[in-house]
A protein has these predicted regions:
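A helicase ATPase "motif cassette" and its flanking acidic/Ser/Thr-rich regulatory loops
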Residues: 1-86, 118, 147
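Pre-ATPase regulatory/linker segments immediately N-terminal to the P-loop/RecA-like helicase/translocase core
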Residues: 2-19, 77-201, 257, 274-302
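Small-residue-enriched segments and motifs
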Residues: 55, 105-108, 554
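Residue-level recognition of conserved beta-strand edge/terminus positions
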Residues: 92-94, 348, 573
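ASCE P-loop NTPase helicase motor core
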Residues: 96, 102, 124, 173-285, ...
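Conserved helicase motor core of SF1/SF2 NTP-dependent helicases
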Residues: 234-236, 244, 336, 350-628
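ATP-hydrolysis module of ASCE/P-loop NTPase motor domains
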Residues: 280-321, 382-384, 596
């Protein structure tokens, strides 16, 4: 067997293992969803943010992509944060007098959602009639079969790939085959720092793959935007993807600010005129040919309804076919115009399989948030590219895996992690951070980044109060702060610690002074790894009139909800307090890295030191803080 065959065999074996682990996760999630749907009461579904009930049904219409959509709005429980987002499948149901749920025999897709209103794509007119005629209507998330189907398809294609670029990339990423580089000079970027400049150059020189490793606050997005901008001097168009819609929005907005024409496939999570202006749907309906296309589509629908009434069917069919041909012509013309104007096509990894991108190939694919994406999801987009640039931080949040066996088997090990280990020459570590006071940053740097990070001079000593200690640990071990288990999804709660957290925040606000806080818009975040604690903290803040003037400056969320964000002041409630030193979820140190690196100027950690310091990470963190 020659060397090339050995590379291929090893790569295929690894991908087949991925396929097996992904199948385990798929079966587990599908079964869990089935059990939830059958056994879980509607109240619990609402609390988890996966269900709205009761619903008001608003207007229905055909959108610019000729999809029948309907607007629905939740009437109650508006304070509960939901998990609906663009592209997710949903199902509708009614509740009868004895509180049994009856599901409609169709699934729909979220087209757009904000806090309380959702636009849903329906499969047809009969589905619309069903929900318009229903009493006591609700909607809930449905199992996302499509994402899994696309991941399995992508893995299958990569495993079978032979004598093409996809096969080469597979063997480079998973084998010992060396990467190649272009031989041209080093380009200076005086507006970037040295490690950012080096990262952009590494991206430009890479023929196969490059990695931009961006620890917290190091300007990963700035670097990535610069790398994309430079790539566009050599390539007409690139594909930019991320795992989440929010990350796609963020990078798209920064590219638009830089003057790059972006076409965003899918709908943004935050809706404003700037964001909407570069979405595919908005651009499609703004095209000069769209009014004519809309008229033709309406004429086709009218002719179909005449056809059902038994008019001259042959004549109508000919008219419909002729109009359909004309509509297809116009759609192709509009699409060609939109794609020829765009320099960047931006979408989620799953959306890169959208039919409107079918057959398209790109010289370069950029994947942001790559350390949060399952490897199989990355391959969905990689199939379209000749070279791949991954950006992210594998020392922060990993992909979400629900099946413990799949996680133990390594499903949470991302493509980015594998390339960092196998191909260290492709990695650029960004080393200067622009977010935190140096004392907040230093522990994370030592533990996660081999002490290689440094603070920019402008943030090194930043603080709100003179002679303030930037990071403190409030030890709750002798304060009757006891944890309680409240169920699988919500984890644990520590009510006494939450009350203490509120008191610590009040004390710090009073130290700063309310007027100064409002004048300077000093903002606060409260983080807990547990949903139950987050919800309890939100309730306490909502009920307490002390916080009324500052509510717009406060955010309370889980660690996952804070990824990519920062605040002037952060309080972390660690919750766990028990004699056995059991810390469960807190064993995932990547999550804690996210939590402790959100604060710019003040970090207050609340936790039971006797429980937590049984773990070496928390012991070291506790000692570090006490030595300051």
């Amino acid at each position: 067997m020659n060397k090339s065959s050995i590379h291929t065999s090893s790569a295929i074996t690894q991908l087949q293992r991925q396929e097996l682990l992904l199948r385990m996760e798929y079966e587990y999630e599908k079964e869990s969803f089935k059990q939830q749907t059958e056994a879980m009461g509607i109240g619990r579904k609402i609390k988890r943010g996966m269900c709205w009930y009761p619903l008001s049904v608003g207007r229905s219409y055909y959108n610019s992509l000729n999809q029948l959509v309907v607007e629905v709005e939740r009437r109650e429980d508006k304070d509960i944060e939901h998990v609906f987002e663009f592209g997710r499948p949903v199902c509708f149901f009614t509740q009868d007098a004895s509180e049994r749920l009856h599901y409609f025999n169709f699934t729909a897709t979220v087209n757009y959602v904000d806090e309380d209103c959702m636009v849903v794509i329906l499969p047809g007119a009969s589905a619309l009639m069903d929900i318009q005629g229903a009493d006591r209507l609700g909607v809930q998330l449905y199992f996302d079969e499509t994402s899994y189907r696309l991941m399995f398809e992508a893995l299958g294609q990569v495993i079978k790939a032979k004598d093409n670029r996809l096969a080469e990339l597979r063997d480079i990423f998973h084998g010992t085959q060396k990467t190649s580089v272009f031989n041209f000079g080093f380009t200076r970027f005086p507006w970037l720092n040295p490690t950012q400049e080096e990262a952009v150059n590494k991206v430009m020189h890479a023929k196969d793959v490059a990695i931009v490793h961006g620890p917290p606050g190091t300007g990963k997005t700035t670097t990535l935007v610069e790398a994309i901008y430079e790539t566009l001097h050599r390539e007409n168009q690139v594909l930019v993807c991320a795992q989440s819609n929010m990350a796609v929005d963020w990078i798209s907005e920064k590219l638009v600010d830089r003057g790059v024409p972006v076409l965003r496939i899918g709908n943004p999570t935050r809706v404003n005129d700037k964001m909407l202006s570069f979405t595919y749907e908005r651009r499609f309906e703004s095209h000069p040919d769209y009014p004519q296309l809309w008229s033709i589509r309406k004429a086709i629908r009218d002719l179909y309804s005449q056809n059902r009434k038994g008019a001259n069917r042959e004549s109508l069919r000919q008219k419909i076919n002729s109009l359909k041909d004309r509509a297809t012509e116009l759609e192709i013309r509009i699409n060609e115009a939109l794609f020829s104007e765009a320099r960047v096509i931006a979408c989620t990894l799953v959306s890169s399989a959208n039919r409107i991108l079918m057959g398209m190939k790109f010289g370069t694919l950029f994947i942001d948030e790559a350390a949060q994406a399952l490897e199989a999801a990355c391959w969905i987009a990689i199939r379209k590219a000749d070279r791949v640039i991954l950006a992210g931080d594998h020392c922060q949040l990993p992909p979400t895996i629900k099946c413990i066996e799949a996680m133990r088997g390594g499903l949470d090990e991302t493509l980015m992690q594998k390339i960092v280990c196998n191909k260290p020459e492709t990695v650029s570590l960004l080393k200067t951070q622009y977010r935190m006071n140096d004392e907040i940053m230093r522990f994370s740097s030592e533990w996660f980044y081999h002490g290689e990070l440094n603070s920019a001079p402008e943030v090194k000593y930043r603080s709100i109060l003179d002679f303030d200690t930037p990071i403190v640990w409030v030890n709750t071990e002798n304060m009757d702060c006891n944890e309680e288990f409240v169920g699988e999804s919500f984890g644990r709660i520590n009510k006494a610690e939450a009350l203490l957290c509120i008191e610590e925040l009040k004390k710090y606000i009073n130290k700063i002074g309310k007027e100064r806080l409002l004048d300077e818009r000093i903002d606060f975040g409260m983080i807990s790894p547990y949903k139950a604690q987050v919800q309890y903290l939100r309730q306490l803040v909502k009920k307490d009139t002390f916080f009324k003037p500052f509510r717009s400056l406060m955010t309370i969320n889980t660690v996952d909800g804070f990824q990519g964000q920062e605040r002037d002041v952060i309080l972390i409630s660690l919750v766990r307090a028990n004699e056995d030193g059991q810390i469960g979820f807190l064993n995932d140190l990547r999550r804690m890295n996210v939590a402790i690196t959100r604060a710019r100027m003040k970090l207050i950690i609340l936790g039971d030191a006797s429980t937590l310091t049984k773990h070496p990470f928390y012991k070291k963190l506790y000692e570090y803080i006490n030595e300051l």
